[in-house]
């Protein structure tokens, strides 16, 4: 009936008539029907009570199925408690109540129900409860904070992992210390959250708290760096996005973190630094030029150069002299290799464009000297001749 988009009032009446039927799959259908009603209309108190009854009293789940081997050493639901939870009655009803809480007309009622659900011993159900809990902050920050602390009272790492977004919105300078145990548990997780590793996400939020001068945030960030390379990756990424900022203190701290790992040289860190050029804006080039120049002198650029070149291709028309300065370090750059990268001709194109744009004869001569030098290297010679021939043809 939901798929056929029947009349909302008819669907409501059917839900209220048959919701007590005790069948797991049927009850999941009831929850989906209430979800449809919630999206198309208002969920009234009767429907909220139905969800509450399911979330608090239904026997499903009976066990943590996500921890059980489904065969061949792979646990059910890939070992993910949230995916497991939303495929159970209590978990699905809980998730629907929390999502409804974003726009509910009955926030006090929702808080009361969620507070009872927080006592559920099921990790899967509590993951469903905490995943979207941040939506309740707008109704009452203090109640949401207390609810978060209750849900995570056992500091289970999976529950904390799915509560990281809510944690991010709840943390202030005054309550930061109360979240340190949660952050320390999350730091050791070697798994993904959505599209990124938990460690990378942690690196970003730990650096944010450090930039905001939260008490003990520097100590926690340093602990994170010792714990996980992924935390370093997240911090590098976050720092690169704050190298230009209205607050000079934030700029200085971001620069120090950005520069800190330039010579560490692991494959992941090398790749992360190249990816940082996706965060840079052309109009900010002069503000971060000194950092880019230092980067161009490091050994790490030998392995990953593609995004670096793409950024220079965007700025060369505006700052050809600075691009020529950077090209002087070409021996450090990743070499073109059709088997592994798409760098063919990029360095040569940037250099020729810089030469054509620059006015100062000193820089023109510098560009020619670099060009003569790269022609001595086979990996560049063929591409250089090809590009020059194309320019001659007009």
Identify what each model region corresponds to.
Residues 1-394:
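Non-catalytic all-alpha helical scaffold/repeat segments
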């Amino acid at each position: 009936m939901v798929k056929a988009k029947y009349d909302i009032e008819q669907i409501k009446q059917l839900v209220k008539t048959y919701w007590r039927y005790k069948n797991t799959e049927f009850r999941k259908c009831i929850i989906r029907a209430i979800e449809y009603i919630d999206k198309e209309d208002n969920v009234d108190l009767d429907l909220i009570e139905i969800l509450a009854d399911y979330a608090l009293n239904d026997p499903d789940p009976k066990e943590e199925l996500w921890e059980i081997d489904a065969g061949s050493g792979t646990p059910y639901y890939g070992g993910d408690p949230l995916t497991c939870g939303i495929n159970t009655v209590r978990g699905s009803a809980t998730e629907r109540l929390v999502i409804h809480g974003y726009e509910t007309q009955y926030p006090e009622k929702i808080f009361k129900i969620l507070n009872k659900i927080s006592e559920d011993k099921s990790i899967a159900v509590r993951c469903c409860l905490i995943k979207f809990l941040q939506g309740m902050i707008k109704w009452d920050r203090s109640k949401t904070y207390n609810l978060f602390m209750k849900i995570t009272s056992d500091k289970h790492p999976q529950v904390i992992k799915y509560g990281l977004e809510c944690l991010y919105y709840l943390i202030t300078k005054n309550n930061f210390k109360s979240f340190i145990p949660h952050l320390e548990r999350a730091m050791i997780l070697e798994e993904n959250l959505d599209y990124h590793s938990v460690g990378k996400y942690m690196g970003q939020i730990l650096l944010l708290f450090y930039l905001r001068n939260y008490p003990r945030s520097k100590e926690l960030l340093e602990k994170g760096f010792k714990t996980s390379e992924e935390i370093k990756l997240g911090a590098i990424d976050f720092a690169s996005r704050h190298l230009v900022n209205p607050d000079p203190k934030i700029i200085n701290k971001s620069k120090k973190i950005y520069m800190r790992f330039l010579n560490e040289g692991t494959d992941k860190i090398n790749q992360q630094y190249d990816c940082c050029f996706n965060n840079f804006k052309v109009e900010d080039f002069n503000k971060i030029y000194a950092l880019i120049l230092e980067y161009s002198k490091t050994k790490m650029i030998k392995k990953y150069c593609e995004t670096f070149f793409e950024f220079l291709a965007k700025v060369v028309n505006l700052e050809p002299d600075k691009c020529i300065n950077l090209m002087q370090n070409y021996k450090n750059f990743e070499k073109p290799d059709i088997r592994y990268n798409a760098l063919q001709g990029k360095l040569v194109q940037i250099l020729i464009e810089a030469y054509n744009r620059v006015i100062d004869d000193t820089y023109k001569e510098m560009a020619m000297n670099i060009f003569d030098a790269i022609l001595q290297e086979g990996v560049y010679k063929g591409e250089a001749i090809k590009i020059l021939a194309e320019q001659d043809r007009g």
